[in-house]
């Protein structure tokens, strides 16, 4: 994987045209993976849920803190903290010369993504996005995506206290991204890969700097 940074200045008048040409050249397709997933909390039998999803929609709001062992009970209304797994199987036909990434907007508190039983990446923190390249993990036909999410308290992950509960779940949108071999980098903190900074501003003129991260698979 090769990463290059391109930087240039443009006037406000030409900004839309320049950005339009960049995004057209990127030629990426985004396929939402929201919707029906199989979900299992703490080893319990799987059920169908709709992602984005949290398993604390009711128990975190009723004020029942409960011990963790109580939260393992099916009939308990205690605030549940622990591991859960989201599973989804989907047909994918990887195209030659294309690259594939999976991006999640947020999972609380830590998460691990696997594709066809092979690890794609892990993330800590409930409020930031994650993105991994999964090109070498995909196969033609049926592919199984697994997202392990755990909202167990961890002393090294903030926040530890607040006037809110730490909801567990895959609670923001998740998507599959297809790009060319050379693309605007989706892996830099799962950001858009395009950064715009105002350099000067007056009543008659505005100048901005556009920095773009390009990611190459090394074949181009």
Task: Briefly describe each language-model feature range.
Residues 2-13:
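Bacterial N-terminal signal peptides that target proteins for export
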Residues 186, 196-197, 209:
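Active-site region of glycoside hydrolase catalytic domains
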Residues 194-203:
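Short beta-strand segments of immunoglobulin-like
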Residues 69-78:
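Surface-exposed, low-complexity/disordered Ser/Thr/Gly/Pro/Asn-rich loops and linkers
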Residues 39-42, 81-192, 217:
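Accessory beta-strand-rich segments of carbohydrate-active enzymes
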Residues 11-21:
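Bacterial N-terminal signal peptides
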Residues 25-70, 144-150, 154, 164, ...:
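Accessory carbohydrate-binding/adhesion or oligomerization-edge regions at the termini
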